[in-house]
Amino acid sequence: MSRRGTAEEKTAKSDPIYRNRLVNMLVNRILKHGKKSLAYQIIYRALKKIQQKTETNPLSVLRQAIRGVTPDIAVKARRVGGSTHQVPIEIGSTQGKALAIRWLLGASRKRPGRNMAFKLSSELVDAAKGSGDAIRKKEETHRMAEANRAFAHFR
């Protein structure tokens, strides 16, 4: 048995302008090469563009987009008797949000366009409306889990 204690779960800090944890999670995921100020600039520009496009609160659009992309269930590869099965597992809220943010950023990076702020704002607006690559990724994950439902007892 391990003598080591369990690690405390870290709570995400909130960003300086919007005082929102989701914005901070987004900033930390978009971060490259330690350039946090650039990451903040990209996120704030994207939120400003969302404000201009939708004429609503950009934070509510962000929340709606993340809620729409967050998966309830995912598949995990599990080796049983020499063969690998895709076993569906339920996902907690924190892990689901992290996956949603990763998918949103991945989809916005793949988009054609001028700059990252523009691409991210477009992807967030699309996800809030229920379309876009990130939503497609969620539906694909749910489809995979449904197809492999027979292996759920391998959990």
Swiss-Prot record:
CDD domains: uS7_Chloroplast. Pfam families: Ribosomal_S7. Keywords: Chloroplast, Plastid, Ribonucleoprotein, Ribosomal protein, RNA-binding, rRNA-binding. GO terms for cellular component: chloroplast; plastid; small ribosomal subunit; thylakoid. InterPro entries: Ribosomal_uS7, Ribosomal_uS7_bac/org-type, Ribosomal_uS7_CS, Ribosomal_uS7_dom, Ribosomal_uS7_dom_sf. GO terms for molecular function: mRNA binding; rRNA binding; structural constituent of ribosome. One of its GO terms (biological process) is translation. It is found in: Plastid, Chloroplast. SUPFAM superfamilies: Ribosomal protein S7. PANTHER family: RIBOSOMAL PROTEIN S7. Part of the 30S ribosomal subunit. Belongs to the universal ribosomal protein uS7 family. One of the primary rRNA binding proteins, it binds directly to 16S rRNA where it nucleates assembly of the head domain of the 30S subunit. This is Small ribosomal subunit protein uS7cz/uS7cy. It comes from Arabidopsis thaliana.
